[in-house]
Amino acid sequence: MQVAVSVIDELSRLASCSDDLTILASDEVHADLQLLGSDLSKFSDYQIFNTYGLSTLWSGLGSKVRGHNVVFTLFGPLYLASVPSINIVGFAQAWIIYPDNEIYRSFTAFRKLTSRLKFFSQALVFKRADRLVVELEHVKDQLAGRGVADARRIDVVHNGLSSVYLYPERWKSLQTAIVKTRFSIGFVGRDYPHKNTKLFPQIKRLLLDLHDLSVDFYVTFNAKEWAATTEFFQASVNNVGVLYSAQCPTFYQQMDAVIFPSFLECFSATPLEALVMEKPLFASDRGFIRDVCGDYAWYFNPENPVEAANLIATYVNKNMGHDDVRLAAARQHVIQFSNARQRAVDYLSLMQTIATDRSVA
């Protein structure tokens, strides 16, 4: 959702934004844009429209996109029986390109089968796209290598930091106040299995048992996700609920550090957001994070909570308060990595170029 909010907000601020651009945004994205103060009147056709997976087939979306030269689904797959327009689809389904991951290996035989079928079916839908748009080069390489799409039909447009982080006057307060009493570690994201959030209570206990260090963990789960966690998790972790984009900087500001133990991503903005807020980042030692954060994160094996606890304790006891130069350098690294405005321009340019090429052909 963060990407959709950022892209639409940036498009609304472009003087060159096309008059014939139709925006279909979900309720959640629309609410986020309103809180940001985005001028949605800049679009000649802006509609609130919700689609959910396969139900898209009978949602009426087909009639809404009919007559447009290009349809760009920010993150697919796009479930339509037929797409008469040029079909550009954003790809961020890591399970398709990295199927044999740690979470998959923990599944029962039946769940492995259903998982394979689900993502095989999604891959077939992605194959129908005229062009796929990905956020990093490793995703393009994997898609081409697995035959989901020819490399010539895959465009890389780097994801990055939402511009709201650069304008404190746009930040909003949290609905739930955070009362800090000890070193606080935050996580921003959904509670998907591959996010590996089950580590948090284990790390908290290990820090106390092995290092006599008390810490607090804070997460941003929705009500359903929180209700599905164990009593042990709820007794060990604080939940502030889902945040709007404009509230995320405030959340990071109140944390002493950020943790990101994910097993699997195409790309995630959370590591960049932590670094631009000049917070130490404890993250999975995985290529999808190293490619983005370089040497500015503190890395640990996401399968090893002891290693994570030792890393955090080392930081608190030896580095905290002495890493201002590193944190400032990390912020500059993020600012130079990519640009939210340029991402929106690149998306718009891609649509216009493909439409022009098709009309000439």
Residue spans for each PLM region:
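A charged, aromatic-enriched C-terminal amphipathic alpha-helix characteristic of glycosyltransferases
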Residues: 320, 324-358
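Membrane-proximal helix-turn-helix segments that form the acceptor-binding/catalytic region
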Residues: 111-132
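Short hydrophobic beta-strand element within catalytic cores of glycosyltransferases
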Residues: 280-283
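Conserved donor-binding/catalytic core segment of Leloir-type glycosyltransferases
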Residues: 175-195, 201-204
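Conserved acidic donor-binding segment of nucleotide-sugar-dependent glycosyltransferases
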Residues: 298-306, 314-320
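Nucleotide-activated donor-binding/catalytic signature segment of Leloir-type glycosyltransferases, i.e.
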Residues: 39-44, 227-249
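Donor nucleotide-sugar binding/catalytic pocket of nucleotide-sugar-dependent glycosyltransferases
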Residues: 127-145, 149-168
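Aromatic "clamp/platform" in nucleotide-sugar-dependent glycosyltransferases that forms part
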Residues: 263
